[in-house]
């Protein structure tokens, strides 16, 4: 607004019929005159960085992945219009030390300059310098962990996501059961297990995805509901009184129905129930002991209508989400939490 208020009188003055003044080029200070460089594009080179994001002062490695790099090519690093550095490339792989400014983005231009001072741009790529991925999250997901996911396949997939600067990954439907996410125990991991859709998941594949994600500077977040259990949950220690119901007489448990050939429907428990919170936090502790996940991607199912606890009291799910998030953070304060606000349901409590 200030810029507009200041500019308006200048515009009015310059358009006045009584104003015949003009700027004599000879009176313009030479230190503010910049040479205009004509630029054309010939985007014919593929270039990548070795990570999706970098800490301040970290080494950034660039690699030409496709096309032929001209022998006279330069790389220009800039923040907006401000050029940070400009240097001859000289090879198809080179490094640059990220500046110390945190939470700052840069653009690298690969270009040449001809005898007429005309520049041709062959490639551009961004560089995110941020010490915490949560400042500028760019979230992707993984959803298949079969034995067809070899290390080479995983590397190819994550290389593509890295080129898109994805810095966080949700591991969707990786778990053994909703209420028992780890396949086995930390001391006795299952080599393979059926996921919710009765597909084969391999623990080695999950581990490989995590390790390769970390090599690209990405965070690995395991997915699970905050209040879901399978039909065999009671045999695994889930309490009778933890469930939520669609009636006040605890005769009909609220459940999310799934195809009949899947492992189980999902039955809902009260996310604010302290016993349930402790139970799932224990299961999550096992996950963190066995697998190098960076945090928990928490899911919900949107508005469930009116639900009741075992004792007939109406359940406030958004308040339960807030309570659940606090409990998970208290148990694992160094792990990150993300929660999905399905159709924006409960979002005010999720972020509180």
Show where each model-derived region lies:
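An acidic-aromatic substrate-binding cleft motif
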Residues: 122-177
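Short, well-ordered coil/turn segments that N-cap beta-strands
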Residues: 165-167, 214-218, 292-294, 333-336
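Bacterial Sec-dependent N-terminal signal peptides
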Residues: 8-43
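Active-site neighborhood of glycoside hydrolase catalytic domains
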Residues: 271-351
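Active-site-adjacent "subsite" loops/lids of carbohydrate-active enzymes
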Residues: 131-151, 222, 226-291
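Beta-strand-enriched, solvent-exposed domains that form extended recognition/catalytic surfaces
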Residues: 32-132
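Hydrophobic faces of well-ordered beta-strands that scaffold small-molecule active sites
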Residues: 138-141, 169-171, 220-223, 296-298, ...
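Aromatic- and acidic-residue-enriched carbohydrate-binding clefts of CAZyme catalytic domains
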Residues: 175-206, 234-271, 302-319
